[in-house]
Structures are given as C-alpha cells and as structure tokens.
Amino acid sequence: DACFMGALEVGKEGNINAHRGPGAFAGIGGFANITAKTPTVVFCLSFNAKGLEVTQKKGVVTIEKEGSVPKFVNKVKSVSFSAKRAISNGQKVLYVTERCVFRLTPKGLKLIEVYPGIDIQKDILSQLLFEVEI
C-alpha cells in the first residue's frame, strides 16, 4: 500500500511540515495517521514556491523562473511527519518534485532521480539549503 501526500516544507532530516504555513496554522487532520501507518509514503511538492514557472516539452523539463521561497529547509516550522519514526518503522519514503526525486535514508535525503533537462548543480544542489546524498 502507498499514500500520496502534499507538503509545505521538507527538512534536511526528511521531516515534513504539512500544516503550518506562513502566518497561518491549520489542523493536521488525518495526515499523521495516514503517513504513520502506510508502508510507502510519497510526498508530492514543488521544489520552491512563489513564482516558480516550469515547462515540459517532449519529456524535457525547463525551469523558466525559479520560485523565491524554498520548500527544502534546514528545519521545518512544525513536524507533521517524523522521518526518524519512518526509518524505525521500515517505511519507504519518497519526495517527488517537478525536477527530481529524493528517497529517505537513515542519513537524510538521497537524490535518486533527476529529470531530463534539469541541471543537477544549478536547478537542484544550489537551490538546497543543506547537503544531500547523491
């Protein structure tokens, strides 16, 4: 079984904030229950927010304009999903963006896929606020 969930922020350890946005606080609902008990959790989110413009032609992704608000941060504002708990529970966790895919490991995030047209240094690594395993 798998679940597909959104996320506001991803922390360097793999923790997720899915309920506390800038200047607002929303209830978490069933998010914690679903993500804690599902063997495979896939978080789907844009790499950056606010102004991001992406095109895709013939399987090639192009970042036309970068977003100004990072979604991959050193520490999330609030923990909706615990990466440490997911690792101890043996869950498979993926973070899917418009440009790449990361997998949760005991060391943190590992970059496992980069889409055609994406420059790994310019479009991914230089946009991160922390280092990831490659």
Q: What residues fall within each predicted segment?
A:
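Conserved phosphate- and dinucleotide-binding cores of soluble alpha/beta proteins
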Residues: 1-134
